[in-house]
Amino acid sequence: MRYRILIAACLLPLGLHAQAQDLPDNLDFSLDGIGISNDLFAPDEDNTPAWLQPFTFRLSQQLIAQSNPHSISLADGSRAEKNAYVENHRSSLLLRYQNPFAPGWLLQASGQVKLYWPGDYEYRANRDHIDTEFRLNEFFLQRSEGNSSVKLGAQTVVWGENIGNSVLDVINTSEFRDLTIIDIEDARLNQWMLVWERFYGNHQWSSFVNLYPEFNPPPVRGSPFFFEPAFNLTDYRRDKALFEAGTQMRWSLTGSDISVMAAYLYENQLHYSAPPSGMGNALSEAGDYLLLGVSANRAIGRLLLNLDIAYSHDILVDVMMANGSDTGTVAVRKLGGTAGFEYAIDNEQNLLLGVTAETLLKTDEALAPGQRLLVDRHTGNALLRYSNSLRNGDLLLSVTMQSALDAASVLGSVALQYTLSNHLSLTTQAIATRADNDSALAPLDGDLRLGMTLSWTF
Protein backbone atom coordinates (compact mmCIF):
# COMPACT_ATOMS: atom_id res chain seq x y z
CA MET A 1 0.00 0.00 0.00
CA ARG A 2 2.82 2.44 0.88
CA TYR A 3 4.41 1.92 -2.55
CA ARG A 4 1.11 2.72 -4.32
CA ILE A 5 0.86 5.97 -2.39
CA LEU A 6 4.44 6.86 -3.36
CA ILE A 7 3.82 6.16 -7.06
CA ALA A 8 0.65 8.28 -6.98
CA ALA A 9 2.66 11.15 -5.48
CA CYS A 10 5.22 10.81 -8.28
CA LEU A 11 2.55 10.97 -10.99
CA LEU A 12 0.66 13.93 -9.48
CA PRO A 13 2.81 16.67 -11.11
CA LEU A 14 1.94 15.37 -14.59
CA GLY A 15 -1.61 16.57 -14.17
CA LEU A 16 -0.62 20.11 -12.88
CA HIS A 17 0.23 21.86 -15.13
CA ALA A 18 22.31 55.91 -18.83
CA GLN A 19 21.42 58.83 -20.90
CA ALA A 20 23.74 59.71 -23.92
CA GLN A 21 25.42 63.13 -24.23
CA ASP A 22 24.78 65.30 -27.37
CA LEU A 23 27.54 65.24 -30.00
CA PRO A 24 28.20 67.63 -32.89
CA ASP A 25 26.41 66.69 -36.09
CA ASN A 26 29.60 66.93 -38.16
CA LEU A 27 31.73 64.59 -35.99
CA ASP A 28 33.45 62.06 -38.30
CA PHE A 29 34.22 58.53 -37.07
CA SER A 30 35.50 57.28 -40.44
CA LEU A 31 38.66 55.09 -40.33
CA ASP A 32 39.34 55.40 -44.04
CA GLY A 33 42.19 57.79 -43.54
CA ILE A 34 44.23 55.71 -41.10
CA GLY A 35 44.44 52.47 -43.03
CA ILE A 36 42.46 50.17 -40.71
CA SER A 37 40.53 47.40 -42.43
CA ASN A 38 36.80 47.38 -41.90
CA ASP A 39 36.81 43.71 -40.82
CA LEU A 40 39.71 43.98 -38.34
CA PHE A 41 37.44 43.58 -35.33
CA ALA A 42 34.90 41.32 -36.98
CA PRO A 43 34.35 37.98 -35.22
CA ASP A 44 36.12 34.93 -36.59
CA GLU A 45 34.14 33.25 -39.31
CA ASP A 46 32.69 29.93 -38.21
CA ASN A 47 33.22 27.42 -40.98
CA THR A 48 31.83 24.47 -39.02
CA PRO A 49 29.06 22.70 -40.95
CA ALA A 50 25.65 23.15 -39.39
CA TRP A 51 25.26 19.43 -38.67
CA LEU A 52 28.53 19.41 -36.67
CA GLN A 53 27.80 22.44 -34.49
CA PRO A 54 25.92 20.51 -31.75
CA PHE A 55 28.93 18.19 -31.29
CA THR A 56 31.92 18.58 -28.97
CA PHE A 57 34.86 16.17 -29.06
CA ARG A 58 37.64 15.58 -26.54
CA LEU A 59 40.56 13.34 -27.43
CA SER A 60 42.74 12.31 -24.47
CA GLN A 61 45.88 10.28 -23.85
CA GLN A 62 46.50 9.09 -20.27
CA LEU A 63 49.48 7.48 -18.57
CA ILE A 64 49.47 6.63 -14.83
CA ALA A 65 51.88 4.44 -12.85
CA GLN A 66 52.14 3.11 -9.31
CA SER A 67 55.61 4.52 -8.64
CA ASN A 68 56.42 3.52 -5.05
CA PRO A 69 58.11 0.10 -4.61
CA HIS A 70 57.15 -1.21 -1.16
CA SER A 71 55.73 -4.19 0.71
CA ILE A 72 52.18 -4.73 1.95
CA SER A 73 50.67 -6.96 4.62
CA LEU A 74 48.56 -9.92 3.51
CA ALA A 75 45.55 -11.43 5.26
CA ASP A 76 47.63 -14.34 6.59
CA GLY A 77 50.09 -11.97 8.28
CA SER A 78 52.88 -12.29 5.73
CA ARG A 79 54.18 -9.49 3.56
CA ALA A 80 54.41 -9.20 -0.22
CA GLU A 81 56.60 -6.96 -2.33
CA LYS A 82 54.86 -4.48 -4.61
CA ASN A 83 56.90 -3.12 -7.50
CA ALA A 84 56.44 0.02 -9.54
CA TYR A 85 54.37 -0.59 -12.66
CA VAL A 86 52.27 1.17 -15.30
CA GLU A 87 48.59 0.89 -14.43
CA ASN A 88 46.78 3.08 -16.99
CA HIS A 89 47.91 3.57 -20.58
CA ARG A 90 44.90 4.47 -22.66
CA SER A 91 43.41 6.77 -25.28
CA SER A 92 39.83 7.98 -25.23
CA LEU A 93 37.47 9.96 -27.40
CA LEU A 94 34.59 11.65 -25.59
CA LEU A 95 31.70 12.85 -27.72
CA ARG A 96 29.00 15.24 -26.52
CA TYR A 97 25.90 16.23 -28.44
CA GLN A 98 23.52 19.01 -27.37
CA ASN A 99 20.85 20.23 -29.75
CA PRO A 100 17.91 22.52 -28.86
CA PHE A 101 16.36 21.57 -32.19
CA ALA A 102 13.02 23.33 -31.60
CA PRO A 103 11.52 25.77 -29.07
CA GLY A 104 11.14 23.89 -25.79
CA TRP A 105 12.92 20.76 -27.05
CA LEU A 106 16.43 19.51 -26.23
CA LEU A 107 18.25 16.37 -27.33
CA GLN A 108 21.42 15.62 -25.37
CA ALA A 109 23.80 12.67 -25.50
CA SER A 110 27.37 11.72 -24.68
CA GLY A 111 29.48 8.63 -25.22
CA GLN A 112 33.07 7.50 -24.93
CA VAL A 113 35.36 5.20 -26.89
CA LYS A 114 38.52 3.90 -25.16
CA LEU A 115 41.58 2.05 -26.42
CA TYR A 116 43.77 0.22 -23.89
CA TRP A 117 47.43 0.03 -24.87
CA PRO A 118 50.30 -2.20 -23.63
CA GLY A 119 50.86 -1.64 -19.91
CA ASP A 120 47.23 -0.88 -19.08
CA TYR A 121 45.58 -3.35 -16.71
CA GLU A 122 42.75 -3.77 -19.24
CA TYR A 123 45.39 -4.79 -21.81
CA ARG A 124 46.81 -7.40 -19.43
CA ALA A 125 43.32 -8.68 -18.58
CA ASN A 126 42.72 -9.12 -22.32
CA ARG A 127 45.64 -11.58 -22.56
CA ASP A 128 48.11 -8.91 -23.65
CA HIS A 129 46.03 -7.68 -26.55
CA ILE A 130 44.85 -4.16 -27.28
CA ASP A 131 41.32 -3.81 -25.95
CA THR A 132 38.53 -1.38 -26.85
CA GLU A 133 35.42 -0.20 -25.05
CA PHE A 134 32.42 1.93 -25.95
CA ARG A 135 30.03 3.35 -23.39
CA LEU A 136 26.93 5.47 -23.87
CA ASN A 137 26.76 7.90 -20.98
CA GLU A 138 23.69 10.12 -21.21
CA PHE A 139 21.02 10.09 -23.88
CA PHE A 140 17.78 11.91 -23.21
CA LEU A 141 15.07 14.01 -24.80
CA GLN A 142 13.74 16.97 -22.80
CA ARG A 143 10.53 18.90 -23.32
CA SER A 144 10.06 22.20 -21.44
CA GLU A 145 6.96 24.33 -21.55
CA GLY A 146 5.92 27.05 -19.15
CA ASN A 147 6.78 25.92 -15.62
CA SER A 148 7.05 22.21 -16.45
CA SER A 149 9.81 19.98 -17.80
CA VAL A 150 9.89 16.29 -18.77
CA LYS A 151 13.04 14.25 -19.55
CA LEU A 152 13.07 10.72 -20.93
CA GLY A 153 16.21 8.66 -21.40
CA ALA A 154 19.53 7.76 -19.82
CA GLN A 155 20.31 10.35 -17.15
CA THR A 156 21.25 10.93 -13.52
CA VAL A 157 19.15 12.12 -10.58
CA VAL A 158 21.08 13.65 -7.68
CA TRP A 159 19.51 14.29 -4.29
CA GLY A 160 21.15 16.00 -1.33
CA GLU A 161 22.89 19.30 -0.73
CA ASN A 162 26.37 17.98 0.08
CA ILE A 163 28.56 17.48 -2.97
CA GLY A 164 30.56 14.28 -3.21
CA ASN A 165 29.41 12.20 -0.22
CA SER A 166 25.74 12.82 0.57
CA VAL A 167 23.76 10.00 2.19
CA LEU A 168 20.92 10.89 -0.21
CA ASP A 169 23.00 10.47 -3.38
CA VAL A 170 21.97 6.83 -3.88
CA ILE A 171 19.60 6.87 -6.86
CA ASN A 172 22.09 6.18 -9.65
CA THR A 173 24.55 3.32 -9.69
CA SER A 174 28.30 4.02 -9.75
CA GLU A 175 31.56 2.43 -10.83
CA PHE A 176 34.89 3.30 -9.21
CA ARG A 177 36.91 1.28 -11.69
CA ASP A 178 40.35 2.55 -10.69
CA LEU A 179 42.00 5.44 -8.88
CA THR A 180 41.66 7.80 -11.84
CA ILE A 181 38.02 8.07 -10.71
CA ILE A 182 37.81 9.17 -7.09
CA ASP A 183 34.86 11.59 -7.27
CA ILE A 184 31.26 10.35 -7.25
CA GLU A 185 30.45 12.92 -9.94
CA ASP A 186 32.71 11.01 -12.35
CA ALA A 187 31.65 7.55 -11.15
CA ARG A 188 27.88 7.87 -11.56
CA LEU A 189 26.29 5.71 -14.24
CA ASN A 190 23.27 6.94 -16.15
CA GLN A 191 20.04 4.95 -15.98
CA TRP A 192 16.97 4.97 -18.21
CA MET A 193 14.35 7.02 -16.42
CA LEU A 194 11.41 9.34 -16.86
CA VAL A 195 11.93 12.55 -14.87
CA TRP A 196 9.51 15.44 -14.62
CA GLU A 197 9.66 18.74 -12.79
CA ARG A 198 7.12 21.45 -12.09
CA PHE A 199 7.75 24.88 -10.58
CA TYR A 200 5.27 26.69 -8.35
CA GLY A 201 6.54 30.12 -7.35
CA ASN A 202 9.23 29.52 -4.74
CA HIS A 203 9.00 25.74 -4.70
CA GLN A 204 9.65 22.87 -7.09
CA TRP A 205 8.20 19.38 -7.37
CA SER A 206 10.30 16.73 -9.14
CA SER A 207 9.72 13.00 -9.56
CA PHE A 208 11.25 10.05 -11.39
CA VAL A 209 10.35 6.52 -12.46
CA ASN A 210 12.91 3.88 -13.42
CA LEU A 211 11.42 0.75 -15.02
CA TYR A 212 14.76 -1.08 -15.36
CA PRO A 213 16.92 -0.58 -12.24
CA GLU A 214 20.54 -1.62 -12.67
CA PHE A 215 23.26 -2.47 -10.15
CA ASN A 216 26.88 -1.56 -9.52
CA PRO A 217 29.10 -3.57 -11.89
CA PRO A 218 31.70 -5.83 -10.26
CA PRO A 219 35.35 -4.70 -10.32
CA VAL A 220 37.15 -5.12 -13.63
CA ARG A 221 39.77 -7.87 -13.65
CA GLY A 222 43.22 -6.40 -13.10
CA SER A 223 42.01 -3.10 -11.65
CA PRO A 224 43.27 -1.93 -8.22
CA PHE A 225 39.89 -2.84 -6.69
CA PHE A 226 39.67 -6.33 -8.19
CA PHE A 227 39.80 -9.41 -5.98
CA GLU A 228 39.48 -13.01 -7.11
CA PRO A 229 36.01 -14.11 -5.93
CA ALA A 230 35.39 -17.60 -4.61
CA PHE A 231 32.57 -18.01 -7.14
CA ASN A 232 31.81 -16.49 -10.52
CA LEU A 233 29.87 -13.20 -10.23
CA THR A 234 27.25 -13.03 -12.97
CA ASP A 235 24.59 -10.51 -13.92
CA TYR A 236 21.49 -10.41 -11.75
CA ARG A 237 18.79 -12.76 -12.97
CA ARG A 238 15.50 -10.90 -13.07
CA ASP A 239 12.68 -13.27 -12.19
CA LYS A 240 10.19 -10.41 -11.84
CA ALA A 241 9.66 -6.86 -13.07
CA LEU A 242 11.67 -4.30 -11.09
CA PHE A 243 11.03 -0.59 -10.82
CA GLU A 244 12.08 2.45 -8.80
CA ALA A 245 10.15 5.65 -8.14
CA GLY A 246 10.72 8.77 -6.09
CA THR A 247 9.49 12.30 -5.54
CA GLN A 248 10.97 15.46 -4.02
CA MET A 249 9.49 18.79 -2.94
CA ARG A 250 11.89 21.74 -2.66
CA TRP A 251 11.24 25.19 -1.16
CA SER A 252 13.53 28.16 -1.87
CA LEU A 253 13.53 30.70 0.94
CA THR A 254 15.65 33.77 1.60
CA GLY A 255 19.19 32.43 1.91
CA SER A 256 18.03 28.81 2.29
CA ASP A 257 16.63 25.78 0.48
CA ILE A 258 14.70 22.96 2.14
CA SER A 259 13.75 19.64 0.52
CA VAL A 260 11.78 16.58 1.59
CA MET A 261 11.84 13.39 -0.44
CA ALA A 262 10.66 9.79 -0.56
CA ALA A 263 11.60 6.93 -2.86
CA TYR A 264 11.15 3.21 -3.39
CA LEU A 265 14.58 1.95 -4.50
CA TYR A 266 16.73 -1.10 -5.00
CA GLU A 267 20.13 -1.15 -3.35
CA ASN A 268 22.82 -0.33 -5.88
CA GLN A 269 25.07 -3.11 -4.60
CA LEU A 270 23.98 -6.73 -5.00
CA HIS A 271 24.49 -9.23 -2.18
CA TYR A 272 26.30 -12.45 -3.13
CA SER A 273 26.29 -15.85 -1.45
CA ALA A 274 27.71 -19.30 -2.23
CA PRO A 275 25.70 -21.61 -4.51
CA PRO A 276 24.08 -24.60 -2.74
CA SER A 277 26.31 -27.03 -4.64
CA GLY A 278 29.45 -25.17 -3.61
CA MET A 279 30.42 -24.79 -7.26
CA GLY A 280 29.53 -22.54 -10.19
CA ASN A 281 27.99 -19.09 -10.12
CA ALA A 282 27.38 -17.15 -6.93
CA LEU A 283 23.80 -16.43 -5.93
CA SER A 284 22.90 -12.74 -6.15
CA GLU A 285 20.19 -10.99 -4.17
CA ALA A 286 18.72 -7.53 -4.81
CA GLY A 287 17.25 -5.68 -1.86
CA ASP A 288 14.40 -3.19 -2.21
CA TYR A 289 13.82 -0.56 0.45
CA LEU A 290 12.02 2.68 1.26
CA LEU A 291 14.05 5.90 1.53
CA LEU A 292 12.83 8.98 3.39
CA GLY A 293 15.00 12.09 3.41
CA VAL A 294 15.28 15.75 4.20
CA SER A 295 17.96 18.23 3.17
CA ALA A 296 18.63 21.91 3.75
CA ASN A 297 21.21 24.58 3.12
CA ARG A 298 21.88 28.03 4.54
CA ALA A 299 23.94 30.79 2.90
CA ILE A 300 25.84 33.16 5.21
CA GLY A 301 27.99 35.50 3.16
CA ARG A 302 30.65 33.40 1.41
CA LEU A 303 29.71 30.34 3.50
CA LEU A 304 27.11 27.75 2.51
CA LEU A 305 26.07 25.23 5.19
CA ASN A 306 24.59 21.90 4.07
CA LEU A 307 22.71 19.13 5.88
CA ASP A 308 21.29 15.84 4.54
CA ILE A 309 19.42 13.19 6.56
CA ALA A 310 18.32 9.78 5.24
CA TYR A 311 16.23 7.03 6.80
CA SER A 312 16.29 3.66 4.99
CA HIS A 313 13.73 0.97 5.83
CA ASP A 314 14.49 -2.71 5.06
CA ILE A 315 18.11 -2.36 3.96
CA LEU A 316 19.77 -5.78 3.58
CA VAL A 317 22.95 -6.54 5.53
CA ASP A 318 25.15 -9.62 5.36
CA VAL A 319 25.14 -11.96 8.37
CA MET A 320 26.79 -15.20 9.43
CA MET A 321 24.16 -17.85 10.02
CA ALA A 322 23.84 -19.77 13.26
CA ASN A 323 25.73 -22.79 11.90
CA GLY A 324 28.86 -20.65 11.61
CA SER A 325 29.59 -21.58 7.98
CA ASP A 326 26.81 -20.17 5.79
CA THR A 327 26.08 -16.51 5.10
CA GLY A 328 22.79 -14.77 4.44
CA THR A 329 21.03 -11.42 4.69
CA VAL A 330 18.57 -9.77 7.05
CA ALA A 331 16.57 -6.57 6.60
CA VAL A 332 17.32 -3.73 9.02
CA ARG A 333 16.74 0.00 9.32
CA LYS A 334 19.47 2.56 8.80
CA LEU A 335 19.80 6.22 9.73
CA GLY A 336 22.44 8.44 8.19
CA GLY A 337 23.41 12.07 7.95
CA THR A 338 25.87 14.28 6.09
CA ALA A 339 26.86 17.73 7.36
CA GLY A 340 29.23 20.03 5.54
CA PHE A 341 30.00 23.43 4.14
CA GLU A 342 31.29 25.19 1.04
CA TYR A 343 33.37 28.33 1.53
CA ALA A 344 34.40 30.75 -1.22
CA ILE A 345 37.71 32.05 0.10
CA ASP A 346 37.86 34.53 -2.77
CA ASN A 347 36.96 34.60 -6.46
CA GLU A 348 39.62 31.98 -7.25
CA GLN A 349 39.69 29.70 -4.19
CA ASN A 350 37.02 27.35 -2.85
CA LEU A 351 36.95 24.96 0.10
CA LEU A 352 34.48 22.11 0.64
CA LEU A 353 34.08 19.76 3.60
CA GLY A 354 31.52 17.01 4.14
CA VAL A 355 31.26 14.45 6.97
CA THR A 356 28.96 11.42 6.73
CA ALA A 357 27.91 9.04 9.52
CA GLU A 358 25.50 6.09 9.29
CA THR A 359 24.23 3.63 11.87
CA LEU A 360 22.09 0.47 11.79
CA LEU A 361 19.08 0.69 14.10
CA LYS A 362 18.03 -2.06 16.53
CA THR A 363 19.96 -4.82 14.80
CA ASP A 364 19.45 -7.16 17.77
CA GLU A 365 15.74 -7.28 16.97
CA ALA A 366 16.45 -8.24 13.33
CA LEU A 367 18.99 -10.99 14.07
CA ALA A 368 17.84 -14.52 14.80
CA PRO A 369 19.52 -16.41 17.67
CA GLY A 370 23.06 -17.34 16.69
CA GLN A 371 23.30 -14.89 13.78
CA ARG A 372 25.93 -12.14 13.77
CA LEU A 373 26.58 -9.16 11.54
CA LEU A 374 29.36 -9.29 8.95
CA VAL A 375 29.32 -5.50 8.56
CA ASP A 376 30.00 -2.63 10.95
CA ARG A 377 27.03 -1.16 12.80
CA HIS A 378 28.50 2.33 12.51
CA THR A 379 30.31 3.71 9.47
CA GLY A 380 31.39 7.13 8.28
CA ASN A 381 33.70 9.08 6.04
CA ALA A 382 34.94 12.60 5.44
CA LEU A 383 35.63 14.47 2.20
CA LEU A 384 37.75 17.61 1.85
CA ARG A 385 38.22 19.49 -1.42
CA TYR A 386 40.21 22.62 -2.21
CA SER A 387 40.50 24.34 -5.58
CA ASN A 388 42.47 27.39 -6.70
CA SER A 389 42.31 29.01 -10.14
CA LEU A 390 45.68 30.61 -10.99
CA ARG A 391 47.20 32.57 -13.88
CA ASN A 392 43.88 34.05 -15.01
CA GLY A 393 42.27 30.62 -15.06
CA ASP A 394 44.96 28.92 -17.15
CA LEU A 395 46.15 26.84 -14.17
CA LEU A 396 43.76 24.99 -11.87
CA LEU A 397 44.97 23.38 -8.63
CA SER A 398 42.69 20.71 -7.12
CA VAL A 399 43.33 18.95 -3.81
CA THR A 400 41.14 16.10 -2.52
CA MET A 401 41.29 14.18 0.76
CA GLN A 402 39.01 11.23 1.56
CA SER A 403 39.11 9.32 4.82
CA ALA A 404 37.14 6.89 6.92
CA LEU A 405 36.08 8.53 10.18
CA ASP A 406 38.29 6.13 12.12
CA ALA A 407 41.18 6.88 9.71
CA ALA A 408 41.37 3.19 8.73
CA SER A 409 41.87 4.31 5.13
CA VAL A 410 42.96 7.65 3.67
CA LEU A 411 43.28 8.83 0.07
CA GLY A 412 44.90 12.08 -1.02
CA SER A 413 45.04 13.56 -4.51
CA VAL A 414 46.72 16.65 -5.95
CA ALA A 415 46.02 17.63 -9.57
CA LEU A 416 47.25 20.50 -11.73
CA GLN A 417 45.42 21.28 -14.95
CA TYR A 418 47.22 23.67 -17.29
CA THR A 419 45.40 25.18 -20.27
CA LEU A 420 47.93 25.33 -23.09
CA SER A 421 45.52 26.86 -25.63
CA ASN A 422 41.82 27.16 -26.35
CA HIS A 423 41.81 23.49 -27.36
CA LEU A 424 44.73 21.84 -25.55
CA SER A 425 45.18 21.10 -21.82
CA LEU A 426 47.60 19.05 -19.72
CA THR A 427 46.69 17.54 -16.34
CA THR A 428 49.24 16.07 -13.93
CA GLN A 429 48.15 14.15 -10.84
CA ALA A 430 49.56 12.48 -7.74
CA ILE A 431 47.42 10.05 -5.70
CA ALA A 432 48.57 8.56 -2.39
CA THR A 433 46.74 5.93 -0.33
CA ARG A 434 47.15 4.54 3.20
CA ALA A 435 45.09 1.78 4.78
CA ASP A 436 45.06 -0.44 7.87
CA ASN A 437 45.47 -4.20 7.49
CA ASP A 438 41.78 -4.86 8.19
CA SER A 439 40.56 -2.19 5.76
CA ALA A 440 39.01 -3.01 2.39
CA LEU A 441 41.72 -0.81 0.85
CA ALA A 442 44.59 -2.70 2.53
CA PRO A 443 46.05 -3.83 -0.85
CA LEU A 444 46.52 -0.13 -1.72
CA ASP A 445 48.45 0.75 1.44
CA GLY A 446 51.56 2.78 0.66
CA ASP A 447 50.75 3.25 -3.03
CA LEU A 448 51.78 6.44 -4.82
CA ARG A 449 50.38 6.98 -8.29
CA LEU A 450 51.78 9.61 -10.64
CA GLY A 451 50.25 10.39 -13.98
CA MET A 452 49.40 12.82 -16.71
CA THR A 453 46.58 13.32 -19.21
CA LEU A 454 46.85 15.34 -22.42
CA SER A 455 43.48 16.45 -23.82
CA TRP A 456 42.50 18.12 -27.08
CA THR A 457 38.99 19.57 -27.32
CA PHE A 458 37.49 20.44 -30.67
Predicted features and spans:
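N-terminal periplasmic/intermembrane-space "pro-region" immediately following the signal or transit peptide
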Residues: 18-86, 92, 96, 100-103, ...
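Repeated loop/turn-to-beta-strand initiation elements of outer-membrane beta-barrel proteins
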Residues: 55, 103-107, 147-150, 202-205, ...
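Transmembrane beta-strands of outer-membrane beta-barrel pores
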Residues: 61-69, 113-117, 145, 156-158, ...
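Residues that define the transmembrane beta-barrel architecture of outer-membrane proteins
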Residues: 85-91, 132-137, 144, 188-192, ...
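Residues on the lipid-exposed face of transmembrane beta-strands in outer-membrane beta-barrel proteins
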Residues: 93-99, 138-143, 194-198, 247-251, ...
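Outer membrane beta-barrel
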Residues: 98, 103-223, 254, 433-435
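Outer-membrane beta-barrel "beta-signal"
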Residues: 176, 432, 444-458
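Detector for outer-membrane/organellar transmembrane beta-barrel domains
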Residues: 265, 297-402
